[in-house]
Amino acid sequence: YRQGFDVYSFDHRGQGLSDRLLSDSDMGHVYDFTDYIDDMDIVVKKHDLSEYQQCFIIAHSMGGAIATRYLQTHPEHPVTGLILSAPMFGINLPWYLSPIAIPVTQIMSAVSTLPRYAPGHQAYFPKPFEDNPLSQSYGRYQWFRNLYTEKPELQVGGPSTRW
């Protein structure tokens, strides 16, 4: 604010401090990816952005995929720029799992009406620094770990088969 910027931020459903959709609050889940896009449209429309000369979206990881898809599907958007940090434009799988990942999750979803963790995923489990794939900075990782310890409602484990 003091630098002349107005910042609007939100946690998309099932992440951060937003409501979880399942009784297993660790499971990353959404009924349909377009729900994320619809939520973003609601947030953008809630704020009168017409007074701004420029409007940027800064998005990280899955937020990058959501922001990109929002801009693609809402040509009337007020956004003049998009800044993406490690956008999730695909799921990083070993080469031998890529061809079977979608059929396996479709079968799992058809067999059970209840969402289950996607293969290879589980409830939230804090990895030691040496085994974490997200940060090479011990200080940053400890800050992140401390935040999750102080605010366990932020923790999210693996995604569901329906995610």
Model region roles, listed by residue range:
Residues 62, 66-159:
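Alpha/beta-hydrolase-fold enzymes
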Residues 8, 58, 83:
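Conserved Rossmann-like nucleotide-binding pocket used by diverse enzymes
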Residues 4, 51-53, 77-79:
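Short loop/turn motifs at secondary-structure junctions
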Residues 163:
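Conserved serine/cysteine hydrolase catalytic core
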Residues 6, 25-29, 56, 67-74:
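Localized chelating/binding microdomains
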Residues 49-61:
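Alpha/beta-hydrolase fold nucleophile elbow
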Residues 28-48:
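Alpha/beta-hydrolase active-site loop
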Residues 1-23:
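Conserved alpha/beta-hydrolase
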